Amino acid sequence: MELVVKSVAAASVKTATLVLPVGENRKLGTVAQAVDQACEGAISAVLKRGDLAGKPGQTLLLQNLSGLKAERVLLVGSGKEEALGDRAWRKLVASVAGVLKGLNGADAVLALDDIAVSNRDAHYGKYRLLAETLLDGEYVFDRFKSQKAEPRALKKVTLLADKAGQAEVERAVKHASAIASGMAFTRDLGNLPPNLCHPSYLAEQAKELGKAHKALKVEVLDEKKIKDLGMGAFYAVGQGSDQPPRLIVLNYQGGKKADKPFVLVGKGITFDTGGISLKPGAGMDEMKYDMCGAASVFGTLRAVLELQLPINLVCLLACAENMPSGGATRPGDIVTTMSGQTVEILNTDAEGRLVLCDTLTYAERFKPQAVIDIATLTGACIVALGSHTSGLMGNNDDLVGQLLDAGKRADDRAWQLPLFEEYQEQLDSPFADMGNIGGPKAGTITAGCFLSRFAKAYNWAHMDIAGTAWVSGGKDKGATGRPVPLLTQYLLDRAGA
C-alpha cells in the first residue's frame, strides 16, 4: 500500500472513497462540514435519521453523493469531543481499514485532521500511529499456503493534512513505513518453520542484507570460532543439535567514524525444546518464536537502513538450536564463559541467558555508547506483565528512561523491573560462580541479574519480550514484530531524526 500526503480541500478530491469523521451526537467537524455543504447537506440529512451515532469506530458508507468527485463517502465515528487515546485511535483506523479492504476501490482519501489524539501532536504523533496501523494491518503470511490470499484492490491511501503540518505528516509516514517494513521482516522470520529457519539460514539472510547495503558489514562466527573465543556458555547450548550455532555480527556505519556505536543483542534460539530439561509437548510448536529477539534486532536494522540514520549501530545475533541428544548439555554441567566466570547449568531450558552472556562480553570490543539485549527470555515475564507490555531492566537509569519514553512515543510499551542486589543471591551455586537459574521466585528479575554480571563494562538494558513477541493460538497466531517500534524510536531519538 502506498501512502501519500496532500494539502487540498476534501470536497474537491477525486477518489473511490473519502473518509470523514463524525463525533457523538452526530457532530461534524470543520472538514466534514465543508464536504456536507458541497453535497447540499446530504451527510447531515443521513445523520439526522440516526443511522450513525458517532461512537468510536462505527462506520456508515454513503454512495454517489451529488456535488462530490468521490464515488463513496465513508463516515467513521470519532466519539466524544475529548481526545482519543492511542488504543481507541488505532481501533478507529483499523475499523476504517477493514471497510476499505472490503470495497473494490483502488484508492482512498482520509480526511481525519479534526480528530484529536491525547498526548499526540496533531501532525507527526497522530499520523505516525495511523500510518503504522494501516501498514502493519496489510501483513499476510501465506508463504506455505497452496491458496494465497487474494490481492487487495486498495493500492493507495492519501492523507489530507493542513499546509502548516504537511511536512510533519510526511515525516511521520516516512518513519512509519520504515518501522512497518522492519516489523514485517521480523514477523516473517518469526513465522518461518524451524526446519527452514535455523542459525545458518539467519546467517545467510544477514549476508544478503550486507550485499544490498554498502554501509553494512557482516561477519558470521561459526561454532569453531565461538569455541576458540572461550564462549563456553554459548557453545554449550548448541551441543545437542545437528544445526551448528552462529554468532552473526552486523556493523552499520551511518555516523562519523569516531562515533561510538549503539549495540543491539538478540537472542536467536531458532527452536527450543528445552534440551535435556525437556519442555511439555503442548504448544511446543511455538518455540520457533524463541528467536524473536534476534528477529526484532534484524527488523530494527532494516528500519535504520531504510531511514539511513546518521548513527553507528552494531547488531549481534546469538543463534543456536536447543535440542536433546547424547551430546547435549546436562543439568549439573559447569561451563566457563568468555568473561572467565563459571556457570553451573541447573536447567538446560534456561539457555537464552547462556548465549546472551557470552555475546554481552563480546560486545565490549565495540566500546559502545549503550547495549540493549532483546530476548524471549522467561515465562515469568508473561505471568508478571501479560502480553501487552515488555519487561525492562538495566544498570543505567538514563538508558532505561530513554527506552521507556521511546516505548510510550511508539505505543510499544515496556515496564521497568528492579535489579536489587538481594535478588543476586538467588543465583548462588556451591560449585560454580553462579547457577543459570535462581529458583521459582522473581524469575524474570533473576534472569536479568544473571545477564547484569556480564554487562558491567557499559550502559546496558535488557528487554524480556516473552509475552509480546508473538500471539498464541487462534486466527491471529503469529509473530507481532515487537519491539521494533520501540527500538527504532529509541534510535530515531538518538539520531535526532
Curated annotation (Swiss-Prot):
Q: Which cofactor does it need?
A: Mn(2+)
The molecular function GO annotations come to: manganese ion binding; metalloaminopeptidase activity
GO cellular component terms? cytoplasm
Instruction: Kindly state which keywords UniProt assigns to this record, in alphabetical order.
Output: Aminopeptidase, Cytoplasm, Hydrolase, Manganese, Metal-binding, Protease
List positions binding Mn(2+) 1. D272, D349, E351
**Where does the UniProt annotation locate this protein?**
Cytoplasm
Active site at K279, R353
Coarse class of the protein's main subcellular location: cytoplasm
PROSITE patterns reported for this sequence: CYTOSOL_AP
Q: Which Pfam family, an example, fits this chain?
A: Peptidase_M17
Biological process according to GO: proteolysis
Q: Where does Mn(2+) 2 bind?
A: K267, D272, D290, E351
**What does the similarity note say?**
Belongs to the peptidase M17 family.
Q: What is this protein called?
A: Probable cytosol aminopeptidase
Q: Which organism is it from?
A: Pseudomonas putida (strain ATCC 47054 / DSM 6125 / CFBP 8728 / NCIMB 11950 / KT2440)
Q: What gene is it encoded by?
A: pepA
